[in-house]
Design a protein with these regions (language model features):
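Conserved radical SAM core fold
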Residues: 75, 112, 137-140, 158-176, ...
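Auxiliary Fe-S-binding modules of radical SAM enzymes
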Residues: 1-18, 187, 191-298
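Non-cysteine beta-strand/loop elements that form the S-adenosyl-L-methionine
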Residues: 148-163, 232-241
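Anionic-ligand binding region
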Residues: 167-197
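Conserved Radical SAM active-site core
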Residues: 24-149, 153, 162-164
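Alpha-helix N-cap and loop-to-helix initiation/capping positions
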Residues: 83, 110, 170-178, 213, ...
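Hydrophobic faces of well-ordered beta-strands that scaffold small-molecule active sites
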Residues: 55, 103, 131-133, 154-156, ...
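Alpha-helix-loop-beta-strand connector modules within alpha/beta enzyme cores
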Residues: 118-130, 181-189, 259-265
Length: 298
């Protein structure tokens, strides 16, 4: 049996011991959803966080699991509390009651179909704020098609244009092409960002995290995005890379991105005609910007 929810296409059977790359078996995902946190979050792009905060729901497990992941404790399933689909729907409603501008699903890909059911339940009980799908973009196009009508805002990364680098850091040599296919489907569904009173209501914002020592990859990312989608896209270029103590990090990933590296990438984006987007200042590369995965709101 093959799990085709993402491009990994893990070969699994119905045994609970048959665990996919994301960290879970098919049976586990059918029975329960594991969460690490569900709370107002203020460190997204301004049009997502706004003044009230984004209702961020952090899912345990990940289908990409980059070696440098700042959320490695949840990506590797070290943290996670099991909840039902009914409880997840109630969490969405509780975040809405706290005046969240949106429901922000963080690393949701491996739970896509359970999330659809939770959104259905929550909307039946009055959920009416946008749903944000905050993903690595290592998503199956077929899974994304199932999400159409349930997701208002897609927030995909485009991490690598270099397949060799994608293999070294995420064990996903096909990431550059698969992520482009996924982003194309996202744009097809919801288009470019629609912002009202400073808050995004629908559309796609593409993110790229600049990695230390990898300016060339970042430039190639910009080239690929412009080639595929033109210069009207909204691109959020991030410098918040934070080396986590205790992780074995290859190459120059043991340090933060220099101001010179980051400015080179920004200048390149401007030179390529990209004018819609976001950039960060140097204060973002701190562990204090990484949430505490303490089961708040779960």
């Amino acid at each position: 049996m093959k799990c085709d929810i993402c491009p990994r296409e893990c070969k699994l059977n119905n045994d609970v011991s048959a665990v996919g790359f994301c960290g879970f078996s098919l049976i586990e995902r059918e029975k329960e959803i594991k969460l690490a946190r569900a709370a107002l979050h203020f460190y997204e792009e301004p049009c997502i966080s706004g003044q009230n905060g984004s209702g961020a729901v952090f899912f345990s497990g990940c289908n990409l699991r980059c070696v440098f992941c700042q959320n490695h404790n949840i990506a590797n399933c070290k943290v996670g509390k099991a909840v039902s689909i009914e409880r997840l729907a109630d969490i969405f409603l509780e975040l809405q009651e706290k005046k969240a501008h949106n429901i922000n699903l963080v690393t949701p890909s491996h739970y896509a179909y359970q999330i659809i059911n939770a959104i259905k339940l929550a909307r039946g009980k009055g959920l009416n704020i946008p749903i944000v799908y905050n993903t690595s973009a290592y998503d199956s196009v077929e899974t994304l098609k199932a999400l159409e009508g349930y997701v208002d805002v897609y927030l995909p990364d485009y991490k690598y244009a270099d397949s060799k680098l994608a293999g070294e850091l995420s064990r996903a040599e096909n990431y550059p092409d698969k992520a482009i296919e996924a982003i194309r489907e996202m744009i097809h569904q919801v288009g470019m960002p629609v912002v009202e009173n400073g808050i995004i209501k629908s559309g796609v914002i593409i993110r790229h995290l600049v990695l230390p020592g990898n300016v060339r990859n970042s430039k190639a990312v910009i080239d690929r995005l412009v080639s595929e989608f033109g210069t009207d896209i909204t691109l959020s270029i991030m410098n918040q890379y934070t080396p986590i103590e205790g992780l074995e990090l290859p190459g120059e990933l043991g340090r933060t991105v220099t101001e010179r590296e980051y400015n080179k990438v920004l200048d390149y984006a401007f030179d390529k005609g990209l004018v819609n987007g976001f950039f960060q200042d140097g204060e973002t590369c701190k562990e204090s910007f990484i949430p505490a995965f303490d089961y708040e709101g779960v």
